[in-house]
């Protein structure tokens, strides 16, 4: 949704119209979306990986690196997930030894076994984390994730560089970021 346009429309409404529950929900969605705009610092998170270890944005594997975060779920649209995973596997193969970028999968699954099965089935070899809260999880709210798959590219200092790039746009942006860091 075009949150800027919605925000302007809400601002011109009279008081009683602004008191509606739907308007409150829209304002909350706008507020969350604004917190994850390009150029803002990404929210902190701490989630468990498949081994039960706590992973944060500042974990050792991600320190001083740009970070591509992919939000996904085993229950997501299989065609979109498959296409996204294929692109991500190509990116991972190309950059897995690069010291300027890392990848992290944040699953919005609610079932641990389905999450683990999807990681194996789809051969997602980069770090994967999940809190089993689905789209209602804290991390989904913090990053204003409303659908999967989604992605966010962070700079080495934690600023949001780009959101929801796909295909060639994503590959080009990563190449640009890695080249600038070298």
What does each of the following model-derived ranges do?
Residues 72-75, 115, 126:
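Signature tryptophan residues that serve as conserved aromatic anchors
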Residues 63-65, 71-89:
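Conserved redox-active cysteine motifs that mediate thiol-disulfide chemistry
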Residues 124, 131-179:
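Thiol/disulfide oxidoreductase modules built on the thioredoxin-like
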Residues 57-62, 140-143:
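Short amphipathic alpha-helix with an adjacent loop that forms part of the alpha/beta core around
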Residues 63-67, 98-101, 124-125:
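Loop/turn elements at helix/coil->beta-strand transitions in domains of secreted/extracellular proteins
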Residues 68-69, 103, 151:
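Hydrophobic beta-strand anchors of alpha/beta hydrolase catalytic cores
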Residues 80-122, 134-140:
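Structural microenvironment flanking redox-active thiols in thiol-disulfide oxidoreductases
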Residues 1-57, 65:
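Oxidative protein folding and maturation machinery
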């Amino acid at each position: 949704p075009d949150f800027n346009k919605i925000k302007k429309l809400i601002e011109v409404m009279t008081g009683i119209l602004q008191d509606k529950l739907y308007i409150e929900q829209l304002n909350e969605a706008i507020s969350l979306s604004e917190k994850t705009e390009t150029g803002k610092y990404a929210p902190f998170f701490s989630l468990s990986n498949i081994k039960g270890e706590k992973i944060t944005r500042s974990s050792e594997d991600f320190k001083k690196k740009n970070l591509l975060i992919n939000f996904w779920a085993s229950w997501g649209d299989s065609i979109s997930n498959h296409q996204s995973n294929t692109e991500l596997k190509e990116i991972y193969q190309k950059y897995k030894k690069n010291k300027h970028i890392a990848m992290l999968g944040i699953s919005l699954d609610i079932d641990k076994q389905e999450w683990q099965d999807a990681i194996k089935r789809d051969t997602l070899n980069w770090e994967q984390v999940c809190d089993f809260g689905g789209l209602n999880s804290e991390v989904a709210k913090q990053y204003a994730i409303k659908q999967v798959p989604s992605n966010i590219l962070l700079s080495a200092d934690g600023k949001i560089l780009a959101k929801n790039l796909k295909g060639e746009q994503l590959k080009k942006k990563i190449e640009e970021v890695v080249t600038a860091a070298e």
